[in-house]
UniProtKB/Swiss-Prot annotation:
This is Phosphatase RapI inhibitor. It is found in: Secreted; Cytoplasm. It comes from Bacillus subtilis (strain 168). Contains a predicted signal peptide cleavage site in the N-terminal region, however the propeptide is probably subject to only one processing event, at the N-terminal end of the mature peptide. Keywords: Cytoplasm, Secreted. GO terms for cellular component: cytoplasm; extracellular region. Residues 1-34 form a propeptide. Induction: Expression is stimulated by conditions of low nutrient availability and high cell density. Encoded by the mobile genetic element ICEBs1. Intercellular signaling molecule that inhibits excision of the mobile genetic element ICEBs1 when cells are crowded by cells that contain ICEBs1 and produce the PhrI peptide. Secreted during production, but the mature peptide acts intracellularly, indicating that it needs to be imported into the cell to function. Acts by inhibiting RapI activity.
Amino acid sequence: MKISRILLAAVILSSVFSITYLQSDHNTEIKVAADRVGA
């Protein structure tokens, strides 16, 4: 099911991007969250 994986990855990336955009002053927390996701 490549399509479902692509959709899941898109949702994760969009959520991470929104978190980084809304909390741009918390860089360390964002980096930890990104590392957990695997980015």
